[in-house]
Amino acid sequence: MRTDLAGKAVLVTGGASGIGLACVRAFRAEGARVGVVDRAPGPDVVRADVTDEPALAAAVDTVARRLGGLDVVVGCAGVSGPVGTPLAGTSAAGFATVLAVNVTGQFLLVKHALPWLPDGGAVVLLGSDSAFTAAPGMVPYCASKGAVVAMTRALAVEVPGVRFNCVCPSVVDTPMARADLGAVLDDPAFPVQQAGDVARQVLFLASPASRPVNGQAVLADFGMSARSAFPA
């Protein structure tokens, strides 16, 4: 499938590692010109925390000026939060931190990138299957990803001329996931994606090949959520 992304100007947040880094590599492999915003250092990274509005706004402007504008924006910056912590042990501050990064950070990214996006531009945000399903000890994370899905739909209605979609993968083998799940990912009893799998989904949603797709949450979970509770 042709992506027609060669020469396009792409901004990726959270692009120094994990899914974000996989997206950076995938876009560059297609010939796109990519700028990276991350709070961690790295080659060609413009450093900013997505929860710091002035810093993020300046970083977006820096990348956009370097690239001569933006055609695609990909929001991959995120945190998992206190995974495995029961509700009673979850503080309001801990809950707020997850939403600040995963939700407000995406909002601020879109807000400050929009002036640089032309008609026909595309925004892809990183959601999760946790927007639709849940496991114990994941209330903050699930709430944040549910908000990303709702915000994606609202943005698609609010902003004409730019497409907004989000990818919602199940567990992905990334440094963040390994920090939460540890050795479970060495021999998992459930299907696990690689960061490159998600990057290919992002490429499709960012490309003209997905022109009619707008306001959608693309759930990629190996069909797990499709199963009935009725015993097979």
Q: Language-model segments: which ranges?
A:
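Active-site loop immediately N-terminal to the catalytic Tyr-X3-Lys motif
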Residues: 133-139
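C-terminal helical subdomain
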Residues: 162, 166-169, 183-224
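Residue(s) in the substrate-gating loop at a strand-loop-helix junction
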Residues: 128
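Substrate-binding pocket helix/loop in short-chain dehydrogenase/reductase
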Residues: 83-87, 91-96
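Alpha-helical segment proximal to the catalytic Tyr-Lys
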Residues: 115, 156-158, 211
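Active-site helix of classical SDR
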Residues: 110, 144, 152
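Conserved NAD(P)H cofactor-binding loop of Rossmann-fold oxidoreductase domains
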Residues: 76-83, 222-223
